[in-house]
A protein has these predicted regions:
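Residue-level signal for pocket-adjacent positions within structured domains
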Residues: 37-39, 292
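Hydrophobic membrane-insertion alpha-helices, especially the h-region
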Residues: 18-37
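Soluble "head" domains of membrane/secretory-pathway proteins
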Residues: 3-13, 50-302
Length: 302
């Protein structure tokens, strides 16, 4: 009799263990799929997006808008060339939206790479097909009359750079000259562009100027070296005069214009590198006192 009861209890315990194991696996699978395809969370360590996002904020990122990404994690960790696929999304990214993306220059400034563990959060200033400029530290997109980025910060930077002494300090600190750091453009964070953002299918005729601003994009798309010699351009040794882009590109800017490593310095961002749109601050912790900033919890990012 006792043996039968023991067997019964053991059978019930095993059943419950199996049920709990299956439930745990199901919850884990749902959580993992949600992280890949629906949403994810990122902690922000710097002040480059102040005041919209401050150090210690944890932002919730919507991946549904443009679609979740699929790529080989092993290749990403080994820094091998990646094929990144994106699921069909519900919409498109817009100017002034805050986006999270993989930083495209983790190793070298003259070559696009991919670091699966290094994420940036910036505001989208310009879209594929836009022509972006910076005039007196203020962002402009041709044909668009709305404000772009943090206007107060741009006003402050413009006033700061009126002083020749301040400009000299920025030059010495390496924060005045802008992408592509080439004498053919001479662009700075004060006066930049115009720069056309290629969209998939766009054709450009190569010249010295376009070579300077698009070389790294073409090399990333083709995985071949683009060189210039005596006014001619060679892709992996074969002369080319025109190039058709196969990807879309974005121009990103931090709200804190004084301290933001963004497209002003490193150039254009391939769409495949974008994780998604930062929608809310789901929690925030003061890094000095370790206290929760309750006034920022679940705050909408605008």
């Amino acid at each position: 009799m006792m043996k039968e009861k023991a067997k019964k209890y053991l059978s019930v315990a095993i059943d419950w263990l199996l049920y709990l194991s299956v439930a745990f696996l199901c919850v884990s699978a749902v959580w993992l799929l949600s992280q890949v395809f629906l949403f994810s969370s990122f902690s922000v360590p710097t002040d480059s997006m102040t005041p919209a996002i401050v150090p210690g904020d944890c932002v919730l990122v919507n991946k549904v808008l443009r679609g979740g990404r699929i790529f080989n994690l092993n290749d990403a960790f080994d820094h091998k060339p990646l094929e990144i696929a994106r699921l069909r999304g519900t919409g498109k990214f817009r100017r002034n939206e805050v986006l999270v993306f993989n930083f495209p220059y983790p190793e070298r400034w003259d070559s696009i790479g991919f670091d699966v563990m290094r994420y940036y959060v910036k505001r989208c200033i310009a879209l594929p097909g836009d022509t972006v400029e910076i005039r007196n530290a203020h962002y402009r997109v041709r044909g668009y009359r709305g404000e772009l980025g943090n206007i107060d910060s741009q006003n402050s930077l413009a006033r700061y750079m009126r002083s020749e002494r301040n400009r000299d300090e920025m030059i010495k600190g390496g924060s005045f000259k802008a992408y592509p750091l080439d004498s053919v453009t001479g662009w700075t964070v004060q006066e930049f562009g115009p720069l056309y953002l290629p969209a998939r299918g766009d054709t450009v005729r190569l010249d010295r100027h376009r070579y300077a601003v698009y070389r790294n994009l073409i090399e990333w798309e083709q995985r071949k070296k683009l060189t210039a010699h005596n006014g001619c351009f060679y892709l992996d040794g074969s002369e080319i005069n025109y190039y058709v882009f196969t990807h879309d590109y974005y121009f990103m800017g931090g709200d804190n214009c004084y301290n933001s490593q963004d497209s002003r310095y490193w150039g254009l961002l391939p769409e495949e590198y974008i994780v998604g749109k930062a929608t809310r601050i789901w929690t925030s912790k003061n890094r000095v006192t370790d206290e929760i900033r309750w006034d920022r919890v679940f705050k909408k990012i605008e």
